[in-house]
Amino acid sequence: MINGEHLKIGLLEGAFNKLRKNPTRDSILFRHNVAGDIAIEGTSLIDVNRVDTIAGAIEGANKVVGEIIKGYTFTHCMIDLHASDIIHDAAYKGFLINASCETVEEVKHAKALGINAVIASVDPKETEKELKAVGLYGAQCPAQVKEGMDCNHCQLCAKNRKVVIIFGIHGSHKGKARKAIQIHRAKASNLAKL
């Protein structure tokens, strides 16, 4: 379990260190979970206690340093109305949770609930077209397409936005990812037919 007070102190320490280096800084990015999720262990349900602890720590730290810490993460958790309420409450406190999707249908579902979405793709241009066909705007992750761009400069994933961020899958895991996405899409398609 995460200790909210320790997390708040850690966030403040990091914020003060960054502000000492650059006092005119207008935002500090905090990404929770480079790997992992915010689910209750062994389930696909959002762990409301974990989310509340993180969001509360960010909110508390921002009261001290002036709303400059932008917290964000990604989740593969099931997105229902209860999860949507948790996600919206966290965003209000400064912790933006992106629905991490593998199909356009998952993106549509998340966006219909007002949740920011990202999607993994083996063909980002094709995914952009698929999103456009259902009335959504997608753009590939700027850090993947712009020389010298990184998450700290972009901060798009930490912002409330209309655009769906497309993460192009590359490298040695592309084949495995393609297969996993195809299996996931096939399962989703079969469930839709029931």
Regions found by a protein language model. Give the residues of each.
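Class I S-adenosyl-L-methionine
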Residues: 1-194
